[in-house]
Amino acid sequence: MKTSIRYALLAAALTAATPALADITVYNGQHKEAAQAVADAFTRATGIKVKLNSAKGDQLAGQIKEEGSRSPADVFYSEQIPALATLSAANLLEPLPASTINETRGKGVPVAAKKDWVALSGRSRVVVYDTRKLSEKDLEKSVLNYATPKWKNRIGYAPTSGAFLEQVVAIVKLKGEAAALKWLKGLKEYGKPYAKNSVALQAVENGEIDAALINNYYWHAFAREKGVQNVHTRLNFVRHRDPGALITYSGAAVLKSSQNKDEAKKFVAFLASKEGQRALTAVRAEYPLNPHVVSTFNLEPIAKLEAPQVSATTVSEKEHATRLLEQAGMK
């Protein structure tokens, strides 16, 4: 009896001596389904619970800046790198361990100058087209050529998409500001704007337009749901380093204001790990940046995309692109 009591007291003492793992709050600008899948996998692996507050990345970045040291967020998970760059420039992010930063890599993958965020996955800009109206030979060799009279009322785009804004940045870097503004004005005059990439995709599928500029994963999700043999659309990869072949990146960071930095760093490390990348790419057709992970979707190999080696990684680049959209009458 005394022995049993001693063991019980010892177990209680050990439990009391072991610090409890804190739950963490993630401000999530990534697609909620993908973030939830990774959060659930992380909780199963560590026991740490994750609360997701989901909204647009720019909105969340602005909220974090407003909240400052009072922010309840521990981690910022962003669909676009410029939102992370905004917070890095404001010195609101905590440096990450090299072991986390080094998990994801690849040609053209952006790296934080202050090592305070890490890139996690990539999405390819593509042209989705109606196979009932077009074949590959009918499509343009450059995304710039879709902003012309030939494509009047035939080409769709989503001007409020963060990836669209990053594509504008890519055109500025590769072709110059004048070319970017001309492209935007051409799309404004000849193209058809849609509220979302998914809506533009559906418009092509429904035969309303012939083609649209979107991210690859929208089509992959649609084709997986409907069955690829049952859809009328396919993807065209522009390739040869054209801005139309741009890869955009998601990433994550730990906030300096976090009261749970150890747990937050564990979560970001998990996002970059093999386990985290597998959880993400099982539900979303994004390119894993951990070289040991292969997507469950039938993706075009990233090496064959021939993507330009540019990306939007600074606040000024994003602001410049936004001003060009305003000049073109898109905002």
UniProtKB/Swiss-Prot annotation:
GO cellular component terms given for this protein: outer membrane-bounded periplasmic space
GO molecular function terms listed in the Swiss-Prot or TrEMBL record: metal ion binding
CDD domains named in the record: PBP2_Fbp
Entry keyword Metal-binding: yes
SUPFAM superfamilies: Periplasmic binding protein-like II
InterPro entries reported for this sequence: Ferric-bd, SBP, SBP_1_CS
Function (record text): This protein may be a central component in the iron-acquisition system.
Endpoints of the signal sequence: 1-22
This protein's name: Major ferric iron-binding protein
Miscellaneous comment: Iron co-purifies with FBP and is bound by the protein as a Fe(3+) ion at an approximate molar ratio of 1:1.
Pfam families tied to this protein: SBP_bac_1
Regulation: induction: By iron deprivation.
Family: Belongs to the bacterial solute-binding protein 1 family.
Places the protein is found: Periplasm
Protein's GO biological process: iron ion transport; transmembrane transport
Binding-site residues, Fe cation: H31, E79, Y217, Y218
Source taxonomy: Bacteria, Pseudomonadati, Pseudomonadota, Betaproteobacteria, Neisseriales
Source taxon at top rank: Bacteria
